[in-house]
């Protein structure tokens, strides 16, 4: 599978405050970004997979809501995470 527990742990260690901090906005955004990039590659090959396309749009919306939350609460954390992950504003 493309996202196993070891990969999740690695993402949480890198972007969260610790390996067990799975609920921070940064770690969730990093996880969503990884899943979005994987689904984007999948859709390049399987362009008629409409169920995956819908789930991709839902993930992008979830990530957008988390980014909006970061803008409201701490703009510096927002700027750091979009720079680190290469997300457009």
Curated annotation (Swiss-Prot):
PROSITE patterns: RIBOSOMAL_S15. One of its GO terms (biological process) is translation. Keywords: Ribonucleoprotein, Ribosomal protein, RNA-binding, rRNA-binding. GO terms for molecular function: rRNA binding; structural constituent of ribosome. Pfam families: Ribosomal_S15. One of the primary rRNA binding proteins, it binds directly to 16S rRNA where it helps nucleate assembly of the platform of the 30S subunit by binding and bridging several RNA helices of the 16S rRNA. Forms an intersubunit bridge (bridge B4) with the 23S rRNA of the 50S subunit in the ribosome. Belongs to the universal ribosomal protein uS15 family. This is Small ribosomal subunit protein uS15. It comes from Parabacteroides distasonis (strain ATCC 8503 / DSM 20701 / CIP 104284 / JCM 5825 / NCTC 11152).
